Structures are given as C-alpha cells and as structure tokens.
C-alpha cells in the first residue's frame, strides 16, 4: 500500500517544573501531573475516550523512594545504583529471554543485579486501545562497583543498553524507557489525569524530585505505541525536526569520527541514532551520545540547536567564533522545536532559531520555576509570582539545581565562548575564498567554448530556447526567478515521449500541518547558505587543528571560486578530478556509475579531500553520466565505507541551471557546484546583447537568483541552513526504476517504479546524435508554454477551443468532442494509465442518482477576487449557487454586499494572509476552508501583483492600493498539528454550522498528515495535485513541487480507512479535473467531492495564455484592468452551469455502464479500474498496482463519510457567555458580565462575536457593547474574531493568538493587583497576537511574544514590549510598543505604522529596512500628541504603571519614541485619511 503505518508524526504540549535550589518534593511531581492535565487539549483522545496519544514524566532518580522500595524487598542498594524502566513483551517466554539478555549485558559491565520489580499499575484506568498494546512494565535495580562516579556508571549503562537493544532488535515490544542512575521515566498511553492512577508510584507521597519534565503527545496515528510516548531518555520535544533525514544520514556518516577516551568501546553502541521512527527520539539519541562522550548539556544543545548566528551583525566576535567552530562538526537539527531536557542536575528549555513553538515560564517565591507550552497550567496566587517571561528564538534557559541558579542564553554563551580561544583558532586556520566582487577583471573568467561547441553542449544537456529565454536569461538579468501563472499541464517526465533530464523526475517535498514552511523573503536573517569544506574531525575533541576549513558564502561556485578551490596548495584541501563521462561504445551507464563509486572510494582513501566530479569531457561517443546519479551513488558509497567526512563532493556540471537542479544535487550529497555551462550560456547572451549588462554583473545576478531559489526550496521544508539541507534527500522520485533509486538515490521516496538506466542511456544517446549535428538547432522547448510539436499540454489550444464551443452552444455533442480530446489524450497523468472496465450489470440511467445530487459534490476551486476580475469571481458564485454546488472565495476576502445573495461564495477560504477574514466573512459560509498548501506552489504564500491591487481590491483586503501583496508561506498560527486543531476550534466557535475543510497537497506521507487533520476535528480534507492553477508563482515551484493527486488521494483513503476515521470525514480531490471520466476515477480511488479550478475559468473565456500575473488578461477573466474587463469579458454564469451539467451527464452515463446508482458506491471499487501497459518503454516499467490497493475497513464503518466528527471540547465558557449575552445582543442593549477563566478556556469571545456578526454585521453593535470581565489565565485565542461591540477585560494573562482576526471591539489585559514584577518586563500575552486583525483595539500591560501584529490590517494596539518579527506583513492599523522589541521589526510592512519606545538607542538595528523607514516622533507634533493620547487610553484600560511613568515624564520619553512607517507612505497622510482614528486625534488632558 502507499500508506505506511510506520510513518508517524507528532506534536504536543510540553514543559518542565523544577526547584531552583534542587530540593526534591512530591509537590513538584504533583504539579507536573496537574500541568499535563491542563494541556490535554494539546493532545488527542482516541475513539474509546480513555486512550491518549501518550503522556509522561521524566524525573530525577527518586532516591529516598527507591531505597524504601529496596528495603521493603530486603535489597541492599549501593551508594551508586541505577534503575531501569523497561517495557517487556507480554509473551512470558520472550519477556524471560529479554530479562536474561539484560542481566548478561549489565553483568558484562561489572554491574551487579539487585533485583526486578513489577511496577505497580492499575489497568482499569486504561482505554481499550491502550490496553490492547499494554506491555509488561518492570524495573531493574543495578549496583555499581565501589568507587565508580555517577557519570562513569551512566556511560557504561549507555553501552550496555545499546548492546541489549541490538541483541533484542527482533522483539518489537521490548523497549528501555530509561536505564540511568540520574533520571527515571514514567510514561504511557493514558490520559494525563490518569497517569498517577495508572502508575501508583506517582501517587506515592514518598516519591520526590526536584526536576520533572512532562509531555502530552498529539500523534497522526490512531494506533499509537507505548514507546513513542515522551519524554525520551533525556528530552521531551514539541515540534518536528524538518532536517531529520539529513541529520540521520550525517550521524551515520560520522560514526567513525566519534571517539572518546571516556568510552574506549564506543563503537559497540553504533549506530548511534535510529534511522526510522520518531524524529524526537533520534535527537534524544544524539544528545545521549554527546553527553556520554563527556559534553555537558549546555554545549550539546548549542551544538544541536544553535541560534541564528550567521547573519547577526551585533554578535560578540568570540561567541560567533564558538558557533562557527561548532558548525564545522555538526549541522543544525532544524525545525520547530521547543525542547525541555534534564540530566538530573540541569533542567533546560531550548527553542529553535525561528521561535516556532511557545515556551512561557513563571518563577514563584518558593523557588519553583515552571516552563511550558502555555502559561496558567498550575494555580498559584498572583502575589507568589516574582518573574514571568518566555524563552525566545534560539534561546537556551538552564536551571542548575546544584548551584541554585537560572542561566539565560547570555550567561551560558559567555561561559561557552570562553572555554577555548575559538576566535584565535578560526582566524589562524580557516581560509576564505576571495569574493567574486573583489577580484580584478582578469580573474573574473570569460567564455571558454566557441558558439558551435556551446550549441553542442546545450543540445547534449537538453537546453531549450524556451529555457534560455524564460529561465537562464531572467536569472542573469534580474537576479531572481521568473514568475509564471496557471499550473503545470504537461506530462510527468516518466510519461513524456520527449527526452527529459533526470532532475525532472524529482518532486520537492514541503512542510504542511505538522511543521511549517518558513519565510525566505521576510525572515532571511535566520537562513544561511554558508558552506565549509575540508576534513571533519572528532566532535569530542576541541583543539586548534580542528579548525582547518575553507569557507564561502554559497555552495554555488563562480569561475573564480572554482579556480581558487581546485588550486589550493595545502594537503588539507587536495583536489582531484573524477571524469563522469563514458564511452557508450564500450560500457553502459549503470556500469559506469558503479565504476565511478570504486574510483571515488580509491581516491578518497589515497588522500583526496576535494573530489571534483566533472562532465566537461563529452564528445560524440562520450556521454555524460547525469550528475545527480553520480553524486548520489558516490555519496552512498563514501558513507557506507566510512569515508564521507574525509571528503567533499564538488560538481563541475553542465546539467544544472535552475534552482531545483542545484537543490537536487545538494540534497543527494554535493558540497558545492560549478555550473559551467550556465555561465557559458550567460556569456553568450551578454555577447549577443540579449542581456544588456556586463559579464560580472550577470554572473553575480545569476548566482544571487539561484541562491534565492535555494532559500525558497529549503524554506518550503522549513529548513534554514544549507548544512542541514545537504544530503537530506527531501524529494520524491516519481518515475524512477528501483535499480536506479537503489544505486543512486538510496533513501529517497519512490513508489511507482519507472525509467531504468537503459532508458536514460537511450535518452542521452538520442540527445548526443542531435548535439553534434551543426544543422540541428537547439530545441524550442514547450515545457513552460505550449509549442506546436513540443511537449503535450493538457490545456492545448484544441482543448480550450472545444470546451468554449461546448459551453457557449450548450450542445452535449460539442462537449463530447471536447471530452474525446481529453479522455483519449497521450498519457499525461497517472490516471491516464488506469482504464475504466465496464461492469456486466449495467443499470438504466434513470436509476442513477440525479445530476442535482452530483452538483452538491462539485466545487469551484479557490480563486481570489483580485486574481480574478470581480465579474468572473461573481459569475462563478452565481453559477454554482444556481445548481446547488459551491464556489470558493479564495484568499482575498469578499464584498459584504454579496452576503445573503446568489453571488455569495458558500466556501470561504482562510489562507495565511488572512485577507478580509472578519467574523461576518466567516459566519456567511457553509464551508470554511483552511488553505494549508496550494497545488501549484506548496510551501509558499499567495501573491497578488501590485497592478492588480486596485482601490476596490485593497478595500476588500484591508491593504494599500498599488502595493504587491504576498501571503506568508506559513499560517503563523499553524506550526504543528495541535495548532491546526486550535484554528479549527476557533472557526467552529465562531461559526458552529460551517464544515471546516483543510486543503493539503499531495506528497509522500500526506495520508499520515490527513489522519492527524481528522483527529484535529476537521470535517473535510482536500487533496490537491501538483497540476492545480495559480495566479502567480515562481516557475520552479510550478514545475517541481507537489505530486500527482492520484498518489495522495489513494494514500489518504488508505490511511483514513486503516485508522478508522474515513467514515467521519469527507474527502475531496482537486487539480486538473476536466471530464466525467476524471470524476469516476477519482471516486473509485477515494474521493466523494471534486474541485474544479481551471476548467470553469476556461468556460468563462480564459484562453490559457499564462499571463494572469501581468494584469493584462486578454479575456478580462484574470485582470483588474477596467478597459479589458469592459471590452473583452464575456463570461456569463450559464457557461459554467453548462460545463457542470455536461460533466454530471457524462458521469451519470458512466455510472450506469458500471452498474452503480450512487457515486459513493464507487468509492473503493478498484476492481472497476485496470492498469494499462503503457505506450513507451518508460511507461511500461511503471508499477501502478499500489493505486488499486485498498485498506481493510473497520467493521461496520463505511469507506466514505457517514457521520459527524464532533470535538471533545465544546467551549463551555464561550457557550455560557453567549447564552447570557444573547438577549441583550438581540435587543441591542449594553450589558456587563464577570467570569473566572483558565488556560483550558480557549477562543473565548468567538461564539459571541459570531452571533453578533450574524445578526448585526462586523460593527453593528459597536455603539452598545457587551462587556465581559475575566479573572485568571486565558487559553489560546482569547478574543479571536472579536466583533465590534464585544469588549473583553482580563486581569491575569493570556496565551497565544490574542485578538487574532479581530474586526472591532476592545481587549484590555492587565496583571493582577499586587504583582511583584514590573509589567513591561513580564510576558502577559503569547505569540502571533493580532494576526490578521482588521479593526478593534488591544491594550496589554506587559510584553507580547514573537510575530506580534503579523498581517495586522487595521487594529490599534498598545503593548509594553514584543519579540522578534513584530508587525510583519502589516498592511494597516497602529501599533504602539512601550518597551523592547526583537529583531526583524517591520519586515514586509506595507501599511499602517508603529510607535516604538527606544530607550537603549539601538532599535534601528532591529528594524528590517527593506520596506520601512524610521523617523523620530518628537519632530512630528501631531504624532506626538496622537501617541500621548494612545498611551493615556492604555493607562485608562489597563492601569499600566509603565504608561503612567511615561506620561509623568513625557518630555524625557517623547524624544525616545521612533515612528516606523512604510517608505511608500506619506507621513502627513498617516493620520489624516483614517476616519476611524478620530478618537486618537484628541489632545488628551495632560
């Protein structure tokens, strides 16, 4: 099957509690359990209502408790002893065998066995699912010989455990939770509240600890396993390690480099890192190795999860040298990571460089510190608190229970940098290439190939005229990728009858739901392409000789870089060239690849450090080995032979020219790449004046363009550094034979077989025959746009013409002509190789369900108003409403005038930009679709060119006319599966009647993700294929990201069925659907609903010219140009209804032939499809049988949606507030209410706002507000979607997403009276507050977290400090900050403005200056008064001491405020044009 049950992803809630001075108590344990219960909403509950996905505790070894246990049994425990917590097999014989092996290996280490203990448990509290997999749970007590130190024992326990695990590898139920003399772990598949009821030890008051880590898991699987509950042996992790495949690969490659005198037999423990299963456990493995090798927990975590140090100009040079030195020994383990860890002495919390997980801490007077995903997870009195804060991006907070100190990053880093003279070592030993920009002209390089030879090389490497003009020229001229529109409607490489280069067979993987893409445009400060080459050394040995490296800023080499590299004199950098061409008359491609591996191995053994793979030596009979094949095969060989870390793979190739090509080479092991033919080609374009720039500029532009493309590809997967991306193999090989994958691309996902070595050799031969014939011109191409005689396009002119003829005439016979062209086309998609086999029991068409029932299953795909003209957008809505289907608003909002009419879009999309998302928008929806990814460009945000942002479009999107709008790549409130569950909860609270849909894009593992989405209580999942359309997207995204929906749909169907969830969720497919045949095939493969994008647009008149992004659509469909819309748009709704009527008719005819009366009865009927043999040699090697496999349904459960998916949390406080306020809302009466609140009360205010928006609109109750006062800690999304007329006052603090999507009203948050801390130094609200807000006011007397005001489009706010990336993508509103800000302030800010207090005078350094400028407020009198008025209101609403201090010393503070505004804004107009700013313009009484 395509669905792999072993693939599991998880996210969670996590935390730690510790007594700072190390005093053990049962209170610490009890508080940790209480905290876990308060984060139950961050986990998942399975169908039996009692089984969780896993939770657990890691505590200091409870010495007093264990000594009592031993005494009761008559055991004598030595001064130094260990306790192992083991899961054993239920089978008594296997359990006995495991005990015997455990004892043998421990005794081999001269450790003496004290005894075994059955851990007291109460199975009655477990659910059926947990009970069915419950292992035997036992503890083993072990004494150390006299004189052993605890760390010595810990190291020998590590070696013993690894030997035990290797001997018991076949017993899948055996698992060592912990085997340590420092810490102990209790974990399992119960609910958090049941943990002490299951493990009776935890309820025993004698069990004490000064440290306790806790973890609540949310898995994408409904059959979770006991061992995967966390914590692991040292850490608990919330997030996902995006780089895990590369980290595991490098851990294996470095095995021979790990050496330490502390463990002479360390290699007995290899492999050190598990290569399958949980990413968190792999990181725990590596941390354990580093600690065993003598590293302390602080250096180990700074090595694994370093901050973003490369682009920090203010970093201390000594500290920079420390991180630089470390980077030479290990790549970052990168991805969303909130990590808590402990070795028994230290307890620590570490955050990833992007700050993608929340970590809030509270310190109380009794010396307890809690740090967790949320604040408010245990109940303390306000006057007990001495400090509140958060761990920020890249920060490490350490509690040293021995010295009784809390160490923040500044202190730990000060210690680390001073341990060795890193700066001196680096300056003395690291070589750096002379930058291309600094070289004299004669060293820049020039063309080496004459025109004829250049043409031959271009033809051999399959260049096309189209590629020269649309890809290479654009990169050289503009320094960035070309943008295109529409989707990819050409055949996959393996289906094509044209020769295609091997790069075309690889599809980029991308992050969705369980981890986010990151933002290479606005958050580039965390990203780096910096590359070091040389021999790697032993990470456990810090010495000057380990700093011999040669460093440069990008792995893409220019001529001068390559020359410098290959002419180094030192032995450290010895370079030798390996020719990767072969004589086709004497050998084969496959044999050559194997021979290259042999040669490479021999060269590295003989001392080669820079292994240069070159394909320059081609000739008539000499063909190039495709560079990725050579790189991948040699990488695997060198890793297997323990040689990879002594060599670097440099690729001198003609084959790489666009960013995807370089990403493939790097992803499979290349260290650096010299694309000589791309430079030769650009040189000719300069010589022929096709590019009117000098050679140096063009080469630099090209490399900058490739660098940007690499950043984008890495960021799609959430990866920040090239070191972590290298060897990560984050591609699916679609259409490669297993032999090719096995030899060259080991570890890449490949599911359907395909092209063999022989096929590639034949392609190379065919290209060679053409290459050396001077009269044969370079190919015209046709991959990007239709070219007569070139690559087949599914929307070729004939298809477009016949479809438009059919919808205009309304004649079914015309449609049949169109359908014949589509259904009998050359194999273009995988489904084209699956034929429908008519059944023997045909039925009368009158018995088939009517077209009106099918129409309910048809949606038009999301296309925004802005991308489409208003007329086209409304026509789609009218058409779908008239037949009972659904149109989708897309991500650009919708005109409220359309609500309640036949022009309303019944599906409202919520995308990452949140354009126009208000409570009224959401309540006027039957379906709310969360667009996690888009088929044409997964991992990227939407894009609307400035020419299309007219005043009308800007009004709908709450933005500035004429300014390009780019959505962030991630939803900033979805960094994990539990974040998605929270957004679904937010939406269900505001509009309980709407179905919540989640749009995913097909990729390997999408079934696993879809299972998690279903567990997050979505109602509908859309699986989009790579061939979906787009209004504007980089060309490499359109061509190389996303996979066929056939693979994604089948995997998702199999996953949902296998996990017993399919009957609870609807499954939709979209991407390239054109005819009734597509509907039938998609239904058989699992879909019960269908999305159409391009087809309806073509029906409206689109001619598929691919110029949507230029705003000059010739038919007025995809333009905002008044003249084009008025003179050329003829798209009436009847054309769209005709199209769907034709599809429904064809579908019903096919159903009748198949003997099926209801569409849902087709689902899973794969017997009605048969695999065709294929029409080309490559097609014939495809293995599509996995598409026809079905999962075994759970008894009594359907293969399609038959019931609802209600969440366990119904939002009781929300319901209470709405019930009490409803009569007053109906009567438009103001009323005040009071409530207590806790962190489990989430999305408070959403239900009330939804009801107000439904009855009175977004602002209809603003004059008669409902006021609610709360006391305590608010859960996530306090005040989400706040409508005008809702005023929320909170005394206490709040978690993430405060005021998200608020449209009006007021939120005011103040600390409790009598708080001991200063408000502006304490965190009061969490991350991503005011995300997508369009109005209203937020006042908070304290600090906010990361990404405050991201995509703020109109809210006015005052807070007292924020984290990194503040006001990112802001298009409107006013933000006032009375304290410190983090870095990257104002990135992508195109509207609104901000006031920032800059007491230390360094704020300007933390501003992203690309689009904004910083002015002094004291030079702007009206702004000074306006600011003063805002602060006065802040004080009135929150009683802010900070605000009072500033007002009382106004003359001093006024000079310290900066005003940040977009460069495109006129400072004089910032206040004047804002009618809703009138209140702030009052000059307040002083």
Swiss-Prot record:
SUPFAM superfamilies: Alpha subunit of glutamate synthase, C-terminal domain (SSF69336), FMN-linked oxidoreductases (SSF51395), N-terminal nucleophile aminohydrolases (Ntn hydrolases) (SSF56235). FMN binds at residues 1049-1101. Pfam families: GATase_2, Glu_syn_central, Glu_synthase, GXGXG. Binds 1 [3Fe-4S] cluster. The keyword Metal-binding applies. It is an enzyme of class 1 (oxidoreductase). GO terms for cellular component: cytosol; glutamate synthase complex (NADPH). Gene3D superfamilies: Aldolase class I (3.20.20.70), Glutamate synthase, alpha subunit, C-terminal domain (2.160.20.60), Glutamine Phosphoribosylpyrophosphate, subunit 1, domain 1 (3.60.20.10). It catalyses: 2 L-glutamate + NADP(+) = L-glutamine + 2-oxoglutarate + NADPH + H(+). Optimum pH is 7.6. Its EC number is 1.4.1.13. Keywords: 3Fe-4S, Amino-acid biosynthesis, FAD, Flavoprotein, FMN, Glutamate biosynthesis, Glutamine amidotransferase, Iron, Iron-sulfur, Metal-binding, NADP, Oxidoreductase, Zymogen. Residues 12-402 form the Glutamine amidotransferase type-2 domain. The active site is at 12 (nucleophile). Pathway: Amino-acid biosynthesis; L-glutamate biosynthesis via GLT pathway; L-glutamate from 2-oxoglutarate and L-glutamine (NADP(+) route): step 1/1; Energy metabolism; nitrogen metabolism. [3Fe-4S] cluster binds at residues 1102, 1108, 1113. Its cofactor is [3Fe-4S] cluster; FAD; FMN. The keyword Translocase does not apply. Belongs to the glutamate synthase family. Catalyzes the conversion of L-glutamine and 2-oxoglutarate into two molecules of L-glutamate. Aggregate of 4 catalytic active heterodimers, consisting of a large and a small subunit. This is Glutamate synthase [NADPH] large chain. It comes from Escherichia coli (strain K12).
